[in-house]
């Protein structure tokens, strides 16, 4: 097997340059959609062109927007993307990797879907098949997706000279706070449309920050208390009393996918299995460590395995480790393939994968799907564990399985088929075309090795899509264990 060594500093520089090159080759619909935040819209995804992303946005406006607004009986949806949540000029150190996220200007849940980092966007259901789409204040990347786009107020930035002139010329029109400039004229706009129920992006029961796909870029819960006060004043008492939380509407909009998104979801992975298999420099047993080969974790384990303690432990013949989705076994002298007890783990993995794919159904809640999968696992002689940790007290002949399937690619983890997370994650019903991270962990005991010794495999976010047939894969799943000679 051909092997290559790359030292950590070179690796970092390579991926930095690769990211910059990919961004120039595949321009995004909005700067700053990173693989750390929106996994379906990676800058390295060859399908994620601006034209494709704009097409998806318009398709969702046509198909998903009327559906979710009417399901929630919302006549008008006012979504305020606050311009002060993130600064485009700040350098942030995330995960101790010295990553520069200065292009990420907003953590609003719908910043991609609406194509804006700062705006007041209003959708009105006036009957018919189409929802009126208005950018009342702010800027968007795709103005053609909207019916009306009013220019951004020059008074959002308090450092502009125009604000000084405006205050002098209109002393009685100046709002009490600069936050009020965004809503000037909105009361008249709403009055002309006379909505009965107005959905606004503030939270009452859900925490989008808690439900975020990555904690380093947690989604916001919506407008602030001050925003609510200024918006209420702009609408007047009559329409302010008609405001309700749009939190469930937002969640439904995020979880409903159109076909174009499924194309991107598959295209944003690593491609074929051959393309995902690592090529390693010759491993020297007793010298080369897991860190040297950029491995993720050891698969051959004691019952009380501590992965952090093993990162610098030299690899030995007969060890199995995982890098990305792929498991690797280091052959012992004289072996031409892994022994049967090692190969058996893959039979168990495939069995778990099939049970999952056949028992996630459109319309079930995450909790219902979890129970269904657990029942099937136990029916196949496996043991379910509610945390990713080998349980030495269970039957030593039973393979133990932990589950944490959840939505990926939209920034939020719900719906979630897992014992983890807030309750609303698993209360959420599973919609058609849900983009699902198929994440499960298999701990298979090997009694002949000794008590508690086992083989571990983690399916980390295999890309699944929920259809009428169950879970289907947007990318071919891993097919087996790779041998290292």
Residue ranges and their predicted role:
Residues 18-22:
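Sec/Tat signal peptide C-region and signal peptidase I cleavage site
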Residues 23-485:
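Active-site neighborhoods and metal-handling regions in enzymes and metal-associated proteins
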Residues 1-7:
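Bacterial N-terminal signal peptides that target proteins for export
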Residues 8-16:
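Bacterial N-terminal signal peptides
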